[in-house]
Amino acid sequence: MRMNIKHNLNIVGEHFFDNSGLEFVVTNEAGRSERGDMLYDVQYVKSGYINKNRRRMEIRSGKIKDKYAPIISGVAYIGDIVIPNKKCIERKLYETWKNMIYRCYNPKCYAYKYYGMKGVTVCKEWLCFKNFFYDAKGLAGYNEELIMRKIIELDKDIIDRSLKQYNKETCQWVTVAENRSEGGKTRWNNYRMQQ
């Protein structure tokens, strides 16, 4: 004979931790899923990010994420945007953004000595991928097809080599050849010698 044990189903107000160790609180019930599961909204204590319509199982197991937690090199975060796991412009721009962050803030990155160690930074707005994603589409030279085919890439040196910050005023999309010539020549040759 199976016993029917009632669990406390009201988790509103309870605090939990996600799989990254970040604390969040269940703020309210948000209705039901198509399958009939109770849905809840949760708010992260540190960032204030609200993750909506989460199932109890996701909450209790910690399988939710704070999209405003600085998980990329300890300084950058995704923001409220979805990055598909397939070849698409969102994924390619995410890889471009992540590599830019690594060059400037991760001492373990091969190119850190040419960027972060020399004082190159990323503007505050671009520490959020969502902001970078929308700004990148408005930069001079932007062309989705050429980005996907790896014919053009993001550059901050051609406009003015003395500028030490990635932002929408200093960056543009240029061909790989343009980026490797002149300003990029020394950096590229140094990188190739390390390989």
Where are these regions (language model features)?
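Short, intrinsically disordered low-complexity segments
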Residues: M1, N53-R55, N179, Y191
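Short, cationic Gly/His-enriched loop motifs
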Residues: P84-N106, Y112-Q194
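Positively charged, low-complexity intrinsically disordered regions
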Residues: M3, M57, S61, M193-Q195
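Short, structured interface segments
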Residues: E58-I71, A76, C171-E182
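Short helix-coil boundary/hinge micro-motifs
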Residues: M1-N53, Y68-K98
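Acidic Ser/Thr/Pro-rich low-complexity disordered segments
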Residues: I50-N53, C109-K113
